[in-house]
């Protein structure tokens, strides 16, 4: 049985993330979506909110587990007995950082492979940062996130005194 880990902040989880989950879950026996605490990134949504959102969007995949983690990815990979780390590459600009991380992970986890996946064409330009910015400025994010995520974004932006839907 091959277990893979797909780590990320998922702030928020986008259609691009779900696209990679759908495709990776068809390759591996188990795909663990690791929602990183990432306090240093100052996430828009709390860890608990991001876990709830991920479970709402991904809960229908029978071989996908959503879990949070803090600390080093290598420890999360080991705890889950994963043999593969799945990473998404949207553009060439992602490659340098992801290449460096893959090298470090190979050093820390010599028996674990990193697999890069590109999103489907219609999702290559989507990022959580851009989606948050559009939502905070009152724009339509419905093509980039699922309806439940759009609702979370609207409620959060409104609670922060931003545009109402």
Curated annotation (Swiss-Prot):
Alphabetical keyword list: ATP-binding, Coenzyme A biosynthesis, Cytoplasm, Magnesium, Nucleotide-binding, Nucleotidyltransferase, Transferase
GO molecular function, one term: pantetheine-phosphate adenylyltransferase activity
Marked site: Transition state stabilizer: 17
Function: Reversibly transfers an adenylyl group from ATP to 4'-phosphopantetheine, yielding dephospho-CoA (dPCoA) and pyrophosphate.
Subunit structure: Homohexamer.
Family classification: Belongs to the bacterial CoaD family.
Name the UniProt record assigns to this protein: Phosphopantetheine adenylyltransferase
Organism, as annotated: Burkholderia cenocepacia (strain HI2424)
């Amino acid at each position: 049985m091959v277990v893979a880990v797909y780590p990320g902040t998922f702030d928020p989880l986008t259609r691009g993330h779900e696209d990679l989950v759908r495709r990776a879950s068809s390759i591996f026996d188990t795909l663990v979506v690791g929602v990183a605490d990432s306090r240093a990134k100052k996430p828009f949504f709390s860890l608990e909110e991001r876990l709830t959102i991920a479970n709402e969007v991904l809960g229908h995949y029978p071989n996908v587990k959503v879990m949070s983690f803090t600390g080093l990815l290598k420890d999360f990979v080991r705890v889950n007995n994963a043999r593969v780390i799945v990473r998404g590459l949207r553009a060439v600009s992602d490659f340098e950082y992801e290449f460096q991380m893959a090298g470090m992970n190979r050093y820390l986890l010599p028996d674990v492979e990193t697999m890069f996946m590109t999103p489907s064409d219609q999702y290559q330009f989507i990022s959580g940062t851009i989606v948050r910015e559009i939502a905070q400025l009152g724009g339509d994010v419905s093509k980039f996130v699922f309806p439940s995520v759009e609702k979370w974004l609207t409620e959060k932006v409104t609670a922060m005194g931003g545009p109402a839907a």
